[in-house]
From Swiss-Prot:
This is Large ribosomal subunit protein bL20c. PANTHER family: 39S RIBOSOMAL PROTEIN L20. It comes from the Eukaryota. The lineage of its organism: Eukaryota, Viridiplantae, Streptophyta, Embryophyta, Tracheophyta. Binds directly to 23S ribosomal RNA and is necessary for the in vitro assembly process of the 50S ribosomal subunit. It is not involved in the protein synthesizing functions of that subunit. The keyword Thylakoid does not apply. One of its GO terms (cellular component) is chloroplast. Its main location: plastid. It is found in: Plastid, Chloroplast. PROSITE patterns: RIBOSOMAL_L20. Keywords: Chloroplast, Plastid, Ribonucleoprotein, Ribosomal protein, RNA-binding, rRNA-binding. GO terms for biological process: ribosomal large subunit assembly; translation. Belongs to the bacterial ribosomal protein bL20 family. InterPro entries: Ribosomal_bL20, RIBOSOMAL_L20_CS, Ribosomal_protein_bL20_C.
Length: 117
């Protein structure tokens, strides 16, 4: 039996992977086996960190709102503000409240003082 060279198909597959890993450092962008492993690892990390990204931002928003409210009054906290917002049916999500805490504190103070009364 004669030997068949798998040139075209294998080369096309490897160049596709090489294009993906071209920005990686060291052997991760040069050696085929490590390129494949690093591509799998990169795609897995991207998938995992999409949810982690959302989680981190929500945590940041909660922290910003809580810090801004506690500056205003000592006996008032984030959880009571959110609870009162739901009771009054004010549709302000955490992202908007965090932006108010940074850009327009007076507006946030007005909202939180309205909730206390």
């Amino acid at each position: 039996m004669t030997r068949i060279r798998r040139g075209y198909i294998a080369r096309r597959r490897r160049t596709k992977i090489r294009l993906f890993t071209s920005s990686f450092r060291g052997a991760h962008s040069r050696l085929t086996r490590t390129m494949i492993q690093q591509k799998i690892k990169a795609l897995f990390s991207a998938y995992r960190d999409r949810d982690r990204h959302k989680r981190n931002f929500r945590c940041l928003w909660v922290t910003r709102i809580n810090a801004a409210i506690r500056e205003n009054g000592v006996s008032y906290s984030y959880s009571t503000l959110i609870n009162n917002l739901y009771k009054r049916q004010l549709l302000l999500n955490r992202k908007i409240l965090a932006q108010l805490a940074i850009l327009n504190r007076n507006c946030l103070y007005l909202i939180s003082n309205d909730m206390i009364k």
